[in-house]
UniProtKB/Swiss-Prot annotation:
PANTHER family: FORKHEAD BOX P, ISOFORM C, FORKHEAD BOX PROTEIN P4. Residues 459-549 bind DNA. Residues 1-25, 609-627 have a biased composition (Polar residues). Residues 1-62, 233-252, 265-310, 379-437, 589-671 are annotated as: Disordered. It comes from Mus musculus (Mouse). InterPro entries: FH_FOXP4, Fork_head_dom, FOXP, FOXP-CC, TF_fork_head_CS_2, WH-like_DNA-bd_sf, WH_DNA-bd_sf. This is Forkhead box protein P4. The keyword Ubl conjugation applies. GO terms for biological process: embryonic foregut morphogenesis; heart development; lung secretory cell differentiation; negative regulation of lung goblet cell differentiation; negative regulation of transcription by RNA polymerase II; regulation of lung goblet cell differentiation.
């Protein structure tokens, strides 16, 4: 039946010649036996088709080889007509409009190769075997590429010749007309190249050719590849008219040359290549023809690995749907995560995640730079948050302080030494618990970013105490059991839901630590409530609770410095090592800690010492010199808080330990260093300059007798950054007889110091200035209730 339909299709061609030719004669000569030599080309073609039809009628069937040869002859004739029409239209560019209207058939070569009289693709698949179909496609592809290459070369030669002739004749023509013609020729050449590239990309999309990177912009040199029989309809439907409806192109089984509207000479706009029809049915049941363009664009944008697909599951925030392959994931992405309100809200949440991670990245980078600068003894230069960095950081560590997104200055700026007290409290590091009071309340923060914290694996930037209080306050009766508090944490935050449940220990620790949480026994068992008074009491920053806060809050208060005579004594005993910048790093010379009224003592209060009394201090305005100490990064106060140096324990430092895993101390500020006075004549060895830990110790300077006419200098307490393993100690020598001699003495904190050099102050009678070297490295805070270290024991 298929052969009869093919014979009827071939017989429909016009016939006007006599004689019957054999199939072999038609294959060899391409014409009929009775064709006259003077007959036109159209007559020869018609007689050849009539001979083929007569042979088909006589024999009853057509072999695949004969059908293939017949198809090649038709394609060659149509291609020749197309090339002749293109050449004639380009020879007279001024008459392009009339030529276009008069031209009967002007289509791309790949479309012109298929005619009405060819068999349908389904008939070709039934007649020819798969190897024969592959051979047919390869031959057609090779022929088409050869035709395109020849046509491309001819067009280039003709355009160059026309440009040369126009340039020679341009001396007599107006320059504007010449420029317009040259521009038109260049546009034609460019559009021809674009047309060929689009056609090649269309073939590559269908899998017929493999385009190399070097062949993307040059002449067509691609080699055809073998295709399967299922791709044959896609090859024949490779190009269609841009204005042709998709339903008509999908309904047509063969392409009609007369119905195509694409012309190679109409260069007003380059023809668009229609994408191939997608064979993946959509879940919503829409026909694939209507959505082929959308499907093809989505498949082109989807590489082998998708950012939202990994390890066999969907990485859309909060989805985690298992997908076997990428195709199933694309189907899931188009159905479950379409453009709707939910997806838009999730996208906004992801934007907030990225913004907060960028802020955290800048903060961690600044912290890393400060650490490196401290280890290398170089002053750090923190960058503002607005500058991008390339250092990876874990998102949201415990106790993270969220800086504002519009901050243009770092959190710990360098403060000049002469900064007044007016601008002191406006900056500097602060603890998270005090920062919560001035920031937006936790309830409004959680209400605004509820979806964010519920789906994103990000630690909330609040203390455990604040979160526990919020959980209790959200309930109607303002009380929760421990298990209900756990459930609130896991329900509100994905961080606690997806990570190891070590945070439960912190919750229990906070419930028992803070006095604001009250345990009440009722019928259901033990429940927890919040005492708002106690909670508000712990909100303001404690001046004695954090060394960092103490240093920063008191550094700008009004206080006096050393007496003029005491300054002269220190100036006379300057150490040459620190005055030479080449011997030590810039960061090794220390500054001394500014003193507050608490350190200076209240007027009329004796200076605490080893059982002796001291005269009342003078008022602060009598001191004119400021001494500064380089502040070191604050440590956990419950582990490293030093005890009172001399005398009874200081009640201001005794208290419950802070929640160290919840609240985070920021590093201290780097201040300009000043040389620390040491003793002339003491030359440290290389052992003294080796790197080691610098402990915290106390320096006490006093007068020998209460009746001394000179006022005693203030007591200095703080951390010193001196030459490694070389420490300066001003000993309080009141009541010491005889004078101290070099040897071992015990320092505050349990360490031993070796006295290297001693000298009397030339201005202050009874005051000894000592230089001591660290003997042992055991420095720790004495346990509660233990006796404080004794004062200096001289050997």
């Amino acid at each position: 039946m298929m052969v009869e339909s093919a014979s009827e299709t071939i017989r429909s061609a016009p016939s006007g010649q006599n004689g019957v030719g054999s199939l072999s004669a038609q294959a060899d000569g391409g014409g009929g036996a009775g064709t006259a030599g003077t007959a036109p080309a159209a007559g020869r073609d018609a007689s050849g088709r009539e001979a083929a039809s007569g042979g088909a009628d006589s024999n009853g069937e057509m072999s695949p080889a004969e059908l293939l040869h017949f198809q090649q002859q038709q394609a060659l004739q149509v291609a020749r007509q197309f090339l002749l029409q293109q050449a004639s239209s380009l020879n007279s560019p001024g008459n392009n409009d009339s030529k276009q209207s008069a031209s009967a058939v002007q289509v791309p070569v790949s479309v012109a190769m298929m005619s009405q009289q060819m068999l349908t693709p389904q008939q070709m698949q039934q007649i020819l075997s798969p190897p024969q179909l592959q051979a047919l496609l390869q031959q057609q592809q090779a022929l088409m590429l050869q035709q395109l290459q020849e046509y491309y070369k001819k067009q280039q030669e003709q355009l160059h010749l026309q440009l040369l002739t126009q340039q020679q004749a341009g001396k007599q023509q107006p320059k504007e007309a010449l420029g317009n013609k040259q521009l038109a020729f260049q546009q034609q050449l460019l559009q021809m190249q674009q047309l060929q590239q689009q056609h090649l990309l269309n073939l590559q999309r269908q899998g017929l050719v493999s385009l190399q990177p070097s062949q993307a912009s040059g002449p067509l040199q691609a080699l055809p590849q073998a295709v399967c029989p299922t791709d044959l309809p896609q090859l024949w439907k490779g190009e269609g008219a841009p204005g042709q409806p998709a339903e008509d192109s999908g309904r047509q089984e063969g392409l009609d040359l007369a119905s195509t509207a694409v012309t190679a000479t109409s260069f007003a706009s380059p023809p668009k290549v229609s994408p191939p029809l997608s064979h993946h049915p959509l879940p919503n049941g829409q026909p694939t023809v209507l959505t082929s363009r959308r499907d093809s664009s989505s498949h082109e944008e989807t590489p082998s690995s998708h950012p939202l697909y990994g390890h066999g599951e969907c990485k859309w925030p909060g989805c985690e749907t298992l997908c076997e392959d990428l195709g199933q994931f694309i189907k899931h992405l188009n159905t479950e995560h379409a453009l709707d309100d939910r997806s838009t809200a999730q996208c906004r949440v992801q934007m907030q995640v990225v913004q907060q991670l960028e802020i955290q990245l800048a903060k961690e980078s600044e912290r890393l730079q400060a650490m490196m600068a401290h280890l290398h003894m170089r002053p750090s230069e923190p960058k503002p948050f607005s500058q991008p960095v390339t250092v990876s950081a874990d998102p949201f560590p415990d106790g993270l302080v969220h800086p504002p997104t519009s901050a243009a200055a770092p959190v710990t700026p360098l403060r000049p030494p002469g900064l007044g007290s007016a601008s002191l409290h406006s900056g500097g590091p602060a603890r998270r618990r005090s920062n919560d009071k001035f920031c937006s309340p936790i309830s409004s923060e959680l209400a605004q970013n509820h979806e964010f914290y519920k789906n994103a694996d990000v630690r909330p930037p609040f203390t455990y105490a604040s979160l526990i209080r919020q959980a209790i306050l959200e309930t109607p009766d303002r009380q929760l059991t421990l298990n209900e508090i756990y459930n609130w944490f896991t329900r509100m935050f994905a961080y606690f839901r997806r990570n190891t449940a070590t945070w439960k220990n912190a919750v229990r620790h906070n419930l028992s630590l803070h006095k604001c949480f009250v345990r009440v026994e009722n019928v259901k068992g033990a429940v927890w409530t919040v005492d708002e008074r106690e909670y508000q009491k712990r909100r303001p920053p404690k001046m004695t609770g954090s060394p960092t806060l103490v240093k920063n809050m008191i550094s700008g208060l009004s206080y006096g410095a050393l007496n003029a005579s005491y300054q002269a004594a220190l100036a006379e005993s300057s150490f040459p090592l620190l005055s030479n910048p080449g011997m030590l790093n810039p960061g090794s010379a220390s500054s001394l800690l500014p003193l507050s009224q608490e350190d200076l003592g209240v007027p009329g209060e004796p200076l605490p010492s080893n059982g002796s009394s001291s005269p009342p201090r003078l008022s602060p305005p009598q001191y004119s010199h400021q001494i500064q100490v380089k502040e070191e990064p604050a440590e956990a106060e419950e582990d490293r808080r030093p005890g009172p140096p001399l005398g009874a324990p200081n009640p201001s430092t005794v208290g419950p330990p802070e929640d160290r895993d919840l609240e985070e101390d920021l590093g201290g500020e780097d201040m300009p260093s000043q040389p620390c006075p040491l003793i002339p004549g003491w030359k440290p060895s290389l052992l003294h300059l080796s790197y080691c830990v610098k402990p915290k110790f106390t320096v006490s300077v006093g007068s020998k007798t209460p009746s001394s006419p000179l006022p005693p200098p203030p007591r200095v307490q703080g951390s010193y950054s001196l030459p490694p393993c070389s420490y300066l100690a001003y000993g309080d020598m009141r009541g010491q007889n005889p004078a101290p001699s070099p040897g071992l003495l015990s320092g505050v904190g349990g360490g031993l110091f070796r006295c290297l050099h001693r000298t009397k102050s030339p201005s202050l009678p009874g005051v000894w200035i000592l230089a001591a070297e660290l003997e042992t490295m055991r420095f720790h805070r004495p346990p509660m209730g233990d006796p404080q270290p004794k004062t200096a024991d001289w050997v």
